[in-house]
Amino acid sequence: MDLVEAEAEEQPPDEDGDEEGYVEADPAGRFIRYDEIVGSGAVKTVYKAFDKLEGVEVAWSQSRIDDSVMGSSKKMKQLNTEIQLLKTLKHKNIEKMFASWVDGEKKTVNIITELFTSGSLTQYRRKHKKVNMKAMKRWAIQILTGLEYLHSQKPAIIHRDLKCDNIFINGNHGKVKIGDFGLATFMQQQKKSIKGTLEFMAPELLTGHYNELVDIYSFGMCMLEMVTCEYPYSECQGMAHIFKKIDEGKKPAAFYKIKDAEVRSFIENCLAPVENRMSATELLKSSFLQDDDLISVSLVKNMSEDGQQPVSCMLRKGEFLLTGNVDVASHVDLWLRFPDPSGCFKSVEFPFNLTEDTSLSVAVEMVEQFGLTQDSRPIIAQLIDAFLVILIPEWTPCVAIRQVVSEGANGLTIEKR
């Protein structure tokens, strides 16, 4: 073995003899590999392994090294430098690397990482077909947070092969991490070469001139796969057809199957031409990814005669938007925009009688009239009560208002009820 580098302590020999069932051990003797495969790719196989020091299962990745790289001391040095760089990454949404070494005899790069009990996002979505958009938003936030960290490095680290197969999840607590940092790309030693998975490649990546925003495009394709459970461009016949559609800037057929306008808009922002494409930081601030439990309030500057309180405001919770005006002491005119069962947005204007109506009774009536899901009822009721609490301080809400976030000239305030 040459270029051996493993962050592992030397282990004493087992008192009871050799471990049974393992295939090989790392140079330091800390990790042992079993023959059980947990994942594989064109040049890589991932096995289940065991950390004898910590007593936990880990993943052992073996990637084949091209002969042209093995025969070049310069390229091998560059490969080893890249591995060392990846080992310095420390982030909650980046896969942890525990040890690594190059086996010159077997012509492989060996990397020990944490093991994800639920596999990749691709495997997880195939197993669990019914996933709420709220959960997928949490996954998206974690992926973007990891990308934001990578892209903030000096110089920026570009994944180049981001896809759901390279994003891993522990299903028991929903933690998502980015892994598999395209070592095959560095093994080829062509930084600007066309390497990766074609279906997830940004058009500019095909030209060889790109920046970290290629990862955002790939993230958009990941979102598309998460939402539709369809692999991008699965409608195409062969790689040449896929290449042509990407080169022409045509989106996968799966994109046009998305009924939710807000989801489509978010994905479209990720797939935009590079000059218009948002960064990870910008996407994390998008309204689409904001906490649905928050009620965002925009206060209109018009003031009542005493100058103390606004007579109009706009509230938003998830995809629901409510605005209105207090006309007289006992009467309020409200306007609500909401997603209907078909995925389109509908708007309705209605009066609210302060002496006869309650937020809950109105919400129940709307759910029945427009065929909305039962989840819509508490959202509508909370928006109405929050609106009235802001404009009529003495109003007593009939549902719990978890959190109201008001944005105005005086900055941000948070009021919990």
Curated annotation (Swiss-Prot):
Residue segments, region Disordered: 1-23
Every Protein kinase domain range: 32-289
Residue sites binding ATP per the record: T113, E114, L115, F116, K163
GO molecular function: ATP binding; protein serine kinase activity; protein serine/threonine kinase activity
Active-site residues from the entry: D180 (proton acceptor)
Catalytic reaction equation(s): L-seryl-[protein] + ATP = O-phospho-L-seryl-[protein] + ADP + H(+); L-threonyl-[protein] + ATP = O-phospho-L-threonyl-[protein] + ADP + H(+)
Biological process terms in GO annotation: intracellular signal transduction
Top-level EC class as recorded in UniProt: transferase
Annotated keywords: ATP-binding, Kinase, Nucleotide-binding, Serine/threonine-protein kinase, Transferase
A Pfam family annotated for this UniProt entry: Pkinase
UniProt xrefs under PROSITE patterns: PROTEIN_KINASE_DOM (PS50011), PROTEIN_KINASE_ST (PS00108)
A GO cellular-component term linked to this record: cytoplasm
Highest taxon in the source lineage: Eukaryota
Presence of the UniProt keyword Ribosomal protein in the record: no
EC number: 2.7.11.1
PANTHER family: SERINE/THREONINE-PROTEIN KINASE WNK WITH NO LYSINE -RELATED
Family: Belongs to the protein kinase superfamily. Ser/Thr protein kinase family. WNK subfamily.
Official protein name in the record: Probable serine/threonine-protein kinase WNK9
Organism this protein belongs to: Oryza sativa subsp. japonica (Rice)
